[in-house]
Amino acid sequence: MDANRREFLKGAGLLAAAACGGGATAAAVPETGAADYATDVLVVGGGPAGVCAAIAAARNGARVLVVEQSGMLGGMATQGLVGPFMTCYDKSGETMIIRGLFEEIVERLVARGGALHPRGVFGNGPYSAWIPKGHDHVTPFDPEALKVLLDEMCAEAGVKVLFHTTFVEPVLDGWRAAGARLFGKGGFRRVSAKIVGDATGDGDYAYRAGVPCTLGDGNGRLMPATMFFHICNIDSDRLIADIEANRHTFHKKDGVSYRGFHWYVTKAIAAGEWDLPRRCLNMYRGVGPDVWLVNNGRIPGVDATDSESLSRAEVEGRRQTKVMMDFLHKYVPGCEHAVLMSTGSTVGIRETRHVAGEATLRVEDVLNGVVPADSILLAANSVDVHGGKDNPMVSSYRTINANWYGVSYRCLVAKGVENLLLAGRCLSGEPAAAGAVRVMPPCMAMGQAAGTAAALALQGGVTPRALDASKLVATLRAQKAFLG
């Protein structure tokens, strides 16, 4: 049996053990021999959180390797076509509070015509799908421009990026994260690292390293997935006029939203032409001429930690896209000749694992504006939970009772495994609290904080758990993060 075959069987067996148990079985196997790559900081996942973690760590002096299973950085923003960036302002709408790397990315996109600055984008308009709550000062952007910019920023910072490379399992030294086993076009590879950042969204590294995790709400329920798609060749003036003429009919009943084009959806349902879980169609105007983003499909029962479930979701997402395109062509003024530009190359996922950390973001703290002393970001994003207990049509949207709330650094420090940091929607948080900060601007701020923390820990010769949080907060402030 050749070496690659032995490695494949070994990897498959270990992964099976991890899937059946708590994740520690696979990770507990020590690695011997020289690593294929050696780095200070390994970031697993190149999405919004991961790319910001990588850039921040590198700018603060660390050698950084990013492992990304696709062929691009940006994750949901580029692969998933998720947009716009949700609000980065406080509740009053007066102050931009998610800044730092996020603001730099926005400003560089604006300078090349790839985004609209959020200061000039308001709720109740076409760039926010006419949704007022939580949609003031969103950031429309062009995902193609973002792909190129993120490549440039990683190159400028000296970040090494491995595309088309899948994370297989952690490498642990006892209960210390020490790297990862990977699989790419050249077969299995191993990377040694001093600190690891889990930016997988699903907490894959943490789970397989044995860190306690909760899937969804802990009772088998997860928020539904959505397939985003972009369309063009729209007569935007006619579309906008139709919405404006009917906007007074927007309402919510029994947790179900009746917003854009619900007056046509009712007709399509009666004609047997609409079998989707939502009773409206949410469209966001894009950056290009007469380009629109559709965020409307709901795919219930998707467990994105399971490949079979995720595969079914991709197929269902494209089927739902076809239903909506037919609907647009037949019913919506200005969309008679709409052209489908693209669907997401991956379905949009709102929720999977919540990883246990040294602190837990609690929904009551979010709603009441609690700001821990070691807060590494401030946000005002509302608690946005899609899908009810037994009804994917409903949603729960709760605005906060303060101008902002904070996320503790300890929510990014994984419990029980040293030198492992979390960034993005897999942070340590109650499911409803994570429903507030799962959107991209807070995830990018978490990434900047995690990457900065990793670099500072290495400089100080301490673990991330032992890092003086006041030093981290001071460094983030100096690097243009807004922390009050």
Predicted regions and their residues:
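N-terminal export signals
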Residues: 2, 7-28
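Flavin (FAD/FMN)-binding glycine-rich loop and adjacent Rossmann-like elements that form
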Residues: 97, 101, 120, 133, ...
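Aromatic pocket-lining residues of Rossmann-like dinucleotide-binding sites
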Residues: 57
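N-terminal Rossmann-fold NAD(P) dinucleotide-binding loop
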Residues: 50
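Beta1/beta-strand and adjacent pyrophosphate-binding region of the FAD-binding site
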Residues: 36-47
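A short, basic/flexible loop-to-alpha-helix module at the beginning of a structural domain
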Residues: 25-37
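Conserved N-terminal/central alpha/beta ligand/cofactor-binding core
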Residues: 11, 62-63, 69-169, 173, ...
